[in-house]
Amino acid sequence: MKIDLIISADDIKEEKVKNKTAVVIDMLRATSVITTALNNGCKRVVPVLTVEEALKKVKEYGKDAILGGERKGLKIEGFDFSNSPMEYTEDVVKGKTLIMTTTNGTRAIKGSETARDILIGSVLNGEAVAEKIVELNNDVVIVNAGTYGEFSIDDFICSGYIINCVMDRMKKLELTDAATTAQYVYKTNEDIKGFVKYAKHYKRIMELGLKKDFEYCCKKDIVKLVPQYTNGEIL
């Protein structure tokens, strides 16, 4: 098995993801939201690229659909919820369809559509994602959403954590230089919360008063679910 890594949604190329197992990571905060919502009983998450498409989809899915997402970290006008995992509690999401659009994460998911399997990864479910990777037994590309098309420390160290979890389960692995570096960064900085504080994205999260979101998104393996994207929906 070979593991590769893409550093941002802007860097996705079809030949890099086609027929592989793609693991999409937007640790702060889209993939953490998706994982949390589904773990709390959300029926499905439908990722879309634009606000206009989200408004159209919510009509298609009817009364059990809710709108969530952000632009530049802020809740979108007219939406039910922002991109805070703390908002997606069981009483809010159980049995609902979440229509979601975000600045970085949903672009990374949609950009990975030629992959054989698309898994949604985060620190919250890193061990479970690693188990699924081993089960699928296919070459892997970890797709970092990044931040506005740029490299993001948070997604990178989360990738390293998941790669490390796979390495604990499989000895015969081939890592690209990017994947090797991510795993090394994690192994030398296993306190993810402490290391992510160096990230530009962290500063933005703090500016928005989202410390609780940050602390939650850094919790390792509190979710055993591995969301999978197929035919336009994440289940």
UniProtKB/Swiss-Prot annotation:
<dbReference type="GO" id="GO:0050532">
    <property type="term" value="F:2-phosphosulfolactate phosphatase activity"/>
</dbReference>
<dbReference type="InterPro" id="IPR036702">
    <property type="entry name" value="ComB-like_sf"/>
</dbReference>
<dbReference type="GO" id="GO:0000287">
    <property type="term" value="F:magnesium ion binding"/>
</dbReference>
<keyword id="KW-0460">Magnesium</keyword>
<keyword id="KW-0378">Hydrolase</keyword>
<comment type="similarity">
    <text>Belongs to the ComB family.</text>
</comment>
<dbReference type="Pfam" id="PF04029">
    <property type="entry name" value="2-ph_phosp"/>
</dbReference>
<dbReference type="InterPro" id="IPR005238">
    <property type="entry name" value="ComB-like"/>
</dbReference>
<dbReference type="GO" id="GO:0050545">
    <property type="term" value="F:sulfopyruvate decarboxylase activity"/>
</dbReference>
<protein>
    <recommendedName>
        <fullName>Probable 2-phosphosulfolactate phosphatase</fullName>
        <ecNumber>3.1.3.71</ecNumber>
    </recommendedName>
</protein>
